[in-house]
């Protein structure tokens, strides 16, 4: 996981990213992303325990958002719609202007790491939704994908 608030000379003027999910899922997704791309600035995972009350989850999201904000807004990615983490992210978004996308997957994170200097959080949320959906594939029913793998 990147160090909280990690900054470099290249980390200004980009969309800040907070990944939130059940248990340690967000932390592991960020760790995997950084295993592929190296350290990603202005990116933070929020870890929640099953017994954490909603207020504690929201406080962690708020703190992480403050640390990753680099001037182009904050995008919060959650694991699924309707859970405590997403609901608390949405409550925070109502007062902060952050954007929230539920249903995060690895292709979305990789795209995000490479596209967030080119746009703002709202436009990036729309791009990620489309990109994430395009990369959910019934692989055994996609012969071209299977042939490429062989």
Predicted features along the sequence, with ranges:
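N-terminal loops that bind phosphate or other acidic moieties
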Residues: 2-150
């Amino acid at each position: 996981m990147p160090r909280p608030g990690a900054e470099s000379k290249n980390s200004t003027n980009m969309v800040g990213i907070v990944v939130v999910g059940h248990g340690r899922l967000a932390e592991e997704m960020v760790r995997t992303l950084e295993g592929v791309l190296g350290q990603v600035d202005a990116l933070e995972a929020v870890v929640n325990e099953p017994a954490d009350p909603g207020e504690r989850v929201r406080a962690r999201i708020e703190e992480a958002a403050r640390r990753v904000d680099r001037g182009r807004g904050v995008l919060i990615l959650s694991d699924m719609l309707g859970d405590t983490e997403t609901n608390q992210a949405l409550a925070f978004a109502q007062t902060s202007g952050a954007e929230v996308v539920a249903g995060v997957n690895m292709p979305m994170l990789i795209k995000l790491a490479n596209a967030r200097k080119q746009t703002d959080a709202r436009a990036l949320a729309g791009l990620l939704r489309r990109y994430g959906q395009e990369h959910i594939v019934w692989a055994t029913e996609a012969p071209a994908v299977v042939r490429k793998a062989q």
